[in-house]
Amino acid sequence: MANSEKTAAVAEIAEDFRGSSAAVLTEYRGLTVSQLTELRRALGETTRYAVVKNTLTKIAAAQAGVTGIDELLVGPTAVAFVGGDPVEAAKGLRDFARANPALVVKGGVVEGKAMNADEIRRLADLESREVLLAKMAGAMNGSLAKAVGLFAAPLSQVARLAEALRAQREETAGAEPVSVDA
């Protein structure tokens, strides 16, 4: 690879790091070309999966301000540059790795934070951002309904008490007064 090609490759990888919400590093040794194509399809259009040279990736990461991945750049490496939801990409990699054990997740960077392979697996176990937001909205809606019930309850109790007192006075108005002799 000529120097100009290396410079262009470093610039492209650095731009991928800058434009991604996450970058997950994997070892792809043992996967066929058709399996890599299947993985790219499974990750979707917002994720670019690229086989990279470790040395060029280290330089590009440094240029992009990405730290904590140098120790992951050992052996054959491919990077999933995630443009969309990091959780969805982590799930895609996890599911593909279950079906194809040759794919090994090494770790990565999510929103500027370096993560090891276990942290990426935990990320894959999370629910998507949309599901979490929907659950939070549902919980808030339930809490608001409970709060309205709590505020309305004292008023309705006062109204029921006033009605009971009125009914009691109407009943006692027609009764003879009771005298207490001592």
UniProtKB/Swiss-Prot annotation:
HAMAP family: Ribosomal_uL10
One Pfam family cited in the UniProt record for this chain: Ribosomal_L10
Stated name of the protein: Large ribosomal subunit protein uL10
PROSITE patterns noted in UniProt: RIBOSOMAL_L10
The keyword RNA-binding appears for this protein: yes
PANTHER family in the cross-refs: 39S RIBOSOMAL PROTEIN L10, MITOCHONDRIAL (PTHR11560)
Molecular function as annotated in GO: large ribosomal subunit rRNA binding; structural constituent of ribosome
Function noted in UniProt: Forms part of the ribosomal stalk, playing a central role in the interaction of the ribosome with GTP-bound translation factors.
NCBIfam families: PRK00099.1-1
GO CC field: large ribosomal subunit
Keywords on record: Ribonucleoprotein, Ribosomal protein, RNA-binding, rRNA-binding
Subunit structure: Part of the ribosomal stalk of the 50S ribosomal subunit. The N-terminus interacts with L11 and the large rRNA to form the base of the stalk. The C-terminus forms an elongated spine to which L12 dimers bind in a sequential fashion forming a multimeric L10(L12)X complex.
Upper lineage: Bacteria, Bacillati, Actinomycetota, Actinomycetes, Frankiales
Organism, scientific name: Parafrankia sp. (strain EAN1pec)
A Gene Ontology biological process term: translation
TM region positions: none
Family per similarity comment: Belongs to the universal ribosomal protein uL10 family.
